[in-house]
Amino acid sequence: YTIKAVLLFLLVQTILRIVFWLRFESPFDPIPGGDLWQAMYLGLKYDLQVSLGLGIPILLLGWIIPIHPVYSETGKRLCFAYTGVVMLGLLSVYAIDFGHYAYLEQRLNATALRFLENLQISATMVWQTYPVITGSVILVLLVYTSLLLFRFVTGYIQPIPGQYSRWYQKTAVVIITFFVVLFGLYGKLSWYPLRWSDAFFSTHAFSGQLATNPILYFFNTLKNKDETFDIPTARASYPLMAEFLGVDRPDPEKLDYVRRFQYNADPGRTEPNVIVIILESFASYKSGLSGNPLNSTPHLDRLASEGHFYKNFYVTQTGTARSIWTFMTGIPDIELNKTSSRNPLIVDQHTIVNAFESHEKFYFLGGSASWANIR
């Protein structure tokens, strides 16, 4: 019974993902075939996590005989009502998600809660912009159709007397079910579980949007919903910052911080290899680089004196994640809640590595290859 409910939830979400792809993919920038299959595959795993989470209450009802979904008529009605509520909520979330993406080209996230601050204005905008009545009718029809399908596939399930009557049979069923559900929620065979950052596996912007599950993404962004940039304040400070950074074409309207340089490359000169080694837990203040007169780090000092030493590189706070973020983007990590590398709302960043267009990149990480959104 629970398996059929989970499969129904999974089927509905898969169909909606395909609809999302067909509706919102740009014909001028189609997603590559490999990225499409990878996004669909990851999306299926995210959908399975949600489906299993929604199916767990039905699974737990099996422990209570008076409301068992198979052995009790009351349990059947209760589970049917629960499935109807879940389907209504599921389809409503996806309807809001589709509208949110059509409006902002972003999947539903926790920043959408700001629209509730002035509910009257938001409701008026929705009423004037979207086919609310038609959409509501379609929503009700989809819920009704889903429930008819659910009743059809579960209606012939009958209790089997004596099934799993022995204690070791029941124990085996419980253990197997537990590990199957746990594996589905974990998401992959690795030390780390399936995370939101796995969806952003490609530089193609739409692939990450397609792979994301709006329900999971909404909850993953809840901790960052109150953190945003202040455009009026940034515009007021722009002249000072543009002068400080040496912006050659200042534009206070677009807030352009780009600095353009022209280099005269020697004809026939090959691009050099660039090797970056990041030392974690390195006490730089004890080294000669920071002025220690005891010659505590002679080899490192030699690398700096005979190579390129960027003495202005500075991270405002301690921590590996903040240092990596600042190195990769050139932007100080001032995230108040955890670190910027774990904020799903700011994954679209230009990185220094992107500037090496003619280079082939190799990454050797002494840890997880799926570390936050640095991947």
Please provide the spans of the model-predicted regions.
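Transmembrane and membrane-interface helices of multi-pass
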Residues: 1-230
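Soluble catalytic regions of membrane-associated enzymes that act on cell-envelope
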Residues: 190-375
